[in-house]
Amino acid sequence: MEVSADPYEQKLYQMFRSCETQCGLLDEKSLLKLCSLLELRDQGSALIASLGGSHQLGVSFGQFKEALLNFLGSEFDGNTSSGFIERSLVITDEPLNNTYIESPPESSDREVSPKLVVGTKKYGRRSRPQQGIYELSVTDSDNTDEDQLQQQQNQRSLNGCDELGVQVQRSSSQSDLPGSRRLRSVHTSGSKLKRCASLPARRKMNSNTTGATTSPTAAAKLKQLSIQSQAQHSSSVESLDTVTPQQLETISVHSIMEAWELASIPNTRNLLHVLGFDEEEEVNLQQLTKALEEELRGIDGDHEQSNMLRALAALQATELGNYRLAYRQQHEENLKLRADNKAANQRVALLAVEVDERHASLEDNSKKQVQQLEQRHASMVREITLRMTNDRDHWTSMTGKLEAQLKSLEQEEIRLRTELELVRTENTELESEQQKAHIQITELLEQNIKLNQELAQTSSSIGGTPEHSPLRPRRHSEDKEEEMLQLMEKLAALQMENAQLRDKTDELTIEIESLNVELIRSKTKAKKQEKQEKQEDQESAATATKRRGDSPSKTHLTEESPRLGKQRKCTEGEQSDASNSGDWLALNSELQRSQSQDEELTSLRQRVAELEEELKAAKEGRSLTPESRSKELETSLEQMQRAYEDCEDYWQTKLSEERQLFEKERQIYEDEQHESDKKFTELMEKVREYEEQFSKDGRLSPIDERDMLEQQYSELEAEAAQLRSSSIQMLEEKAQEISSLQSEIEDLRQRLGESVEILTGACELTSESVAQLSAEAGKSPASSPISYLWLQSTIQEPAKSLADSKDEATASAIELLGGSPSHKTASRNNLTTSETSIFSTTPFESSQSGPSPTNSGNSNAYGANPGPAPISKPKRSQSPQQAAASEGEIADCETSSTASGKSFESNSKTSCLSHEKCSSPSALKEELKRLKFFELSLKEQIKDLSLQRDGLVMELQQLQEARPVLEKAYARTTHPTLQQRLNQLELRNRHLQNVIKQQQHYTESLMQQSWRQHQVELNDLHSRIETQGVLLADQTQRLQSADILVKDLYVENSHLTATVQRLEQQRARVNLIHQQQQQQRLVGGGLPGMP
């Protein structure tokens, strides 16, 4: 920072530098230290208060200097405008013998009599003067310090010589203290004179005093009084001729000769010549009188003695006239001072009245403010009590609803347990039948083996001779063997189907057990949530706590059903050529039994399928209830909270990594700078040695000036303006997006109002109608809360990829995972939180979720990511132009990452809106990339300069080695070329030193600027994240209130239907009674007319 040549400002800057902690900035502690060093009043509390509100990051030297000047100016104004200081000036030609005369106790004009003050008055006087404004007496004089200084200068100009002693005595006014001692002057000789300041100084004092700050009424009165006093004394004072002390002590020769001629003294010039005053133009009166007295003593003649006496008398007459003039002037000045003093007393009285009125108004205002604050406090207390009561009612209603939900859940649990027991009994019956069938099959197999063995033995006994082996029995045996093989294959297939059926039954049992476990867990979790909510209600009724727990959506068991199938062994019997008809009949009967068992198994399978369909229908029916909807909303909320926490953790880790990298680079840079400084100091020492050795002759070469730094500064300013404009555009787009979201929320409310009829008729729907409604709801855009939130683009998460990367230095990629729960091809763009990110070391990877066109097009470039995040959304299809633009942006990001050693993140891939929203971050990234390149170029230049400096050091070492030879050579002859070379080297060294200092300063400023921008952007990110969290909380609250309204409407509708049914029943009863009465009337009317 440039500091002026003022030594006081330089000293202040040195003190500022000694106290600073940051780079040119002061925090609160360093400000207190600097104020204590400057010895300010109250340690500069007012100065720190003026600086603390507007500068949160720190205070620079310029800001501190301006604030200090304002503080000192206010202090000086307060001191000068506090009141007039009454002083009296006594100016004498010689030192005076002053005596103090005790004045009697008198009633002062400005004295306020002490009274008993009732109440507490904080400001100014405690009572008002009893006398009137125009009944005040006149004091000596009321002068300020400036008037006294001017009077001293005028007195010095009046005296005109330094030999005379000037005495200026200041005393308080006579009316300030009762019984004060007045300063009197005792004149020992007639030549001593007491005078006051000249009239022009008094006029200036009047003009200064009347310019003081007063109220409008007092100012008008003061102006009238000053005009009257000036009109009274201007004529008498201005008519006088001012007489100086020189005129009193000296007189001209011409005036002496005229006075003597009027006194009829002959030969005046000869007389002056005799007295010794012939050649002088002005004569001292005392010396002339002394000379005349000496002449009178020495003269004997009467005539000459009379002439001398007449001359002496004429001199005394002129001196007496001068004294009269001086006395008249003093008298007029005294009158003028008394009038001024009287006017000043009147002004003081007016000011006292104004001060009392002002302080009375201040007290009234303070009382009114206190009353307003008390009223506001009472209203605030009322509002808080009302809120407390409302919150208590709300939470009591919530607890009642939760208890009803618990009762319904317990009933569902009982129903499911009964169904589970029935299924278990059926399963045990099926297992017993299956075991019986298996035993029968094994027995048949054993009988078949025995029969085969017997057939083989009979065939061997019969076919022992080849002569009795006809062809027909062989063919018949071959056919039998083929049929046997087919039967065996069928048996094996039946055994496999039996094993599969067992596996399915085992899986069904496991699923039933898992459902039971899930019910138990949900019940325990509901109880825990009730306990937590009760504790939260006790702690704070109006604040919502942040829950960090596993969402209910993750309570599903992910256990795979174990393979519970049993390995079956199939024994193949030996084939035989012969068979028996009885055995074949037994086998046919067994086949019929197995077929019947297969039919039973198929019927059981159908039964299981029907049960599964009923379970699905029951689940879908339960999902349509508002309780399940609220549960889904709670799960989505917890997922969003978890995603937000993951995002915060991710960015914190990123920031910590960036800070560590920045600190490492700064340490490396400081080490290099330290080494370069050491080398530079050594070089400077050697250059000084050479300067001492050789003389400095020759002219300096011109320094090369370059305008690169100015151009770079102008470019940086232009880029900063662009960044500001882009940030303004982005804020406008965010405001538009918020308005669109609000309109969509209103649409959702309307849809919820239309869906009341569907919810009221849900109790009368069958399983098929429930399935159809669920399918239609799956197709609709607002079928589930998660799909609706996806449509509103409120759910978003920069999920971390779970794939292990080879390079641990680069962080895991940020994913935009696809697949919303309601529909896969949702056509809406989401604004991810990573769009506002600035520094990121993760490359961008696109996720492949479903058959979306963006992912299918980029399947070759990017690998498929692992499983989707708990909350995900598919991307929209985009035009080829937009896709090309997004690919170009990704390529730019990749090139910038390879050049600067860091990769910047870019999520602007999907549509024009997201591209416009990401314009400011991309501009920031380009600017940071360019600054990084510029920093690298500066480092290269510094390295080049350090190499040049090392070369110069080597040259200087060589010159030192050649020093004795050069000394001998210079002793013989002179070498101007070496001298010029040395001068050039010195100039070059100085130029290099200046360049290095400039570059160091510029790099430091760049680093500070980038760090400040980084901090500002981090704060902006935090604020945006907080606003988004608040918006999400508001939306969830609105959705919960909408769900509660739907529930209330459903309950009311059910009550209304019940009342309608009851009324219809009553109407039917009334109609029946009416019909019966009519019939009775008809019967009663027919009896008397009978024959």
UniProtKB/Swiss-Prot annotation:
Broad class of the protein's primary localization: cytoplasm
GO molecular-function terms, A-Z: microtubule binding
Region (Sufficient for interaction with ens): 487-526
Bias (Polar residues) ranges: 168-177, 822-845, 894-913
Bias (Basic and acidic residues) ranges: 527-537, 547-563, 616-634
Job description of the protein: Required for the positioning and anchorage of the microtubule minus-ends in various cells. In fat body cells, part of perinuclear non-centrosomal microtubule-organizing centers (ncMTOCs) which function to accommodate the organization of microtubule (MT) networks to control nuclear positioning and dynein motor-based retrograde endosomal trafficking. Within the ncMTOCs, Msp300 and shot anchors the ncMTOC at the nuclear surface and recruits the MT minus-end regulators Patronin and Nin for assembly, anchoring and/or stabilization of circumferential and radial MTs at the ncMTOC.
Protein name in UniProt: Ninein homolog
Organism: Drosophila melanogaster
